[in-house]
Design a protein with these regions (language model features):
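CN hydrolase (nitrilase-like) catalytic-core segments centered on the catalytic cysteine
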Residues: 1-86
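A structural signal for well-ordered alpha-helical scaffolds and beta->alpha junctions
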Residues: 24-28, 92, 118
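Cysteine/selenocysteine-centered motifs that mediate thiol-based redox chemistry or coordinate metal-sulfur cofactors
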Residues: 96-123
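A short, polar/charged loop-to-alpha-helix boundary motif
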Residues: 83-100
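Residue-level signal for alpha-helical context at structural boundaries
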Residues: 49, 91, 114-117
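A generic membrane alpha-helix/interface feature
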Residues: 19, 57, 88, 108-110, ...
């Protein structure tokens, strides 16, 4: 099973030097955590390029870096840079079953406790 997670995330040019590495690392970490929590492959797909604002000022720079992580969060394929890429990675369906059996987040979830999840505040 593969979860395709399309994103359009990047940074403003003024933030790149100070926050760029942290932001990109956080994006990769959360995508990989989706793999682990759900026991599936995740294709973290991200837009590339630079968007100029209507007034001509610099807009968001999308960093690309699309990747595929296995059900344990290991990156098995990734785009090498911020250019447009087609990423190919090998998917082993038996790995999904193996990880779910030995790392059973889905099996052990407490769905009976989900009732309040749609509430903004829990009293």
């Amino acid at each position: 099973e593969i979860l395709f997670y399309p994103t359009a995330i990047g940074w403003h040019p003024e933030e790149k030097a100070e926050f760029g590495h942290q932001q990109q690392d956080a994006w990769r970490t959360i995508q990989r955590s989706h793999s682990i929590a759900n026991g599936v492959y995740v294709a973290g797909v991200n837009r590339v390029g630079h968007e100029i604002m209507i007034d001509g000022t610099p807009g968001i720079e999308f960093w690309g870096r699309t990747f595929l992580s296995d059900p344990f969060g290991v990156i098995v394929a990734e785009a090498p840079d911020e250019s447009e890429q087609i990423v190919y990675g090998e998917v082993d369906p038996s790995r999904v079953e193996e990880v779910r059996r030995h790392w059973p987040f889905l099996r052990d979830r407490r769905i009976d406790e989900y009732g309040d999840i749609t509430k903004r505040f829990i009293d």
